């Protein structure tokens, strides 16, 4: 059970939990954190953010049935997700250069993921979990930390990252996320 505070600022501002993303936002840009989580200013998402969700979904489909998904199916899913109000993309996102660029790269991200997840020395079984919620309660902190692990295997977890460049070293954001998971 979490510690109950008098004049709990989290309760006052409707913050029921932290996530790895929220913690990273606070560390990297406290003003953005205040805008998003205190003042509830919801900025628009974009094609790059939706790309990650799209690749995650199609890789999960691949892992479930070991059948490749066509490039047209991937692009169709991406387009429908960018258009979906849940992802909160700007209404003009489908006309943007960023959207066209991401659309053209989707199949490459998917193929890299399939190659990695199909390597004989790494992957032999279906994941035992997908988008599994974790909750960390600390008696000294008034709200829990909550996150979702993309893929769970018997002896590994995978948090999918899609990026145009392979970083030479892991970022502090990723280290914080790894510490939570």
What are these regions (language model features)?
Residues 1, 60, 142-146:
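Accessory terminal regions of nucleic-acid processing enzymes
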Residues 1-27:
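Terminal, charged accessory segments of proteins
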Residues 9-15, 30-42, 157, 161-163:
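Short amphipathic alpha-helical segments and their helix-coil junctions
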Residues 19, 28, 144-148:
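Short, flexible loop/turn motifs enriched in small residues
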Residues 20-68:
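Nuclease catalytic cores
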Residues 58-137:
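A non-catalytic, helix-rich entry segment at domain boundaries
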Residues 125-127, 132-181:
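Mg2+/Mn2+-dependent nuclease catalytic core
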């Amino acid at each position: 059970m979490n510690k109950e505070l008098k004049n709990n600022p989290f309760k006052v501002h409707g913050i029921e939990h932290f996530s790895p993303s929220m913690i990273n936002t606070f560390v990297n840009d406290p003003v953005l954190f205040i805008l998003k989580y205190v003042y509830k200013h919801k900025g628009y998402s974009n094609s790059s953010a939706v790309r990650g969700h799209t690749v995650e979904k199609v890789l999960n489909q691949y892992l479930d049935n070991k059948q490749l998904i066509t490039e047209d199916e991937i692009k169709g899913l991406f387009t429908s997700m960018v258009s979906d109000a849940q992802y909160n993309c700007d209404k003009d996102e489908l006309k943007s250069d960023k959207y066209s660029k991401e659309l053209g790269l989707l199949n490459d991200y998917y193929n890299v993921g399939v190659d990695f997840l199909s390597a004989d020395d790494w992957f032999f079984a279906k994941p035992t979990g997908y988008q599994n919620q974790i909750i960390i309660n600390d008696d000294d902190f008034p709200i829990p930390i909550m996150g979702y692990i993309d893929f769970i295997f018997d002896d590994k977890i995978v948090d999918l990252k899609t990026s145009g460049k392979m970083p030479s070293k892991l970022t502090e954001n990723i280290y914080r996320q790894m510490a939570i998971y």
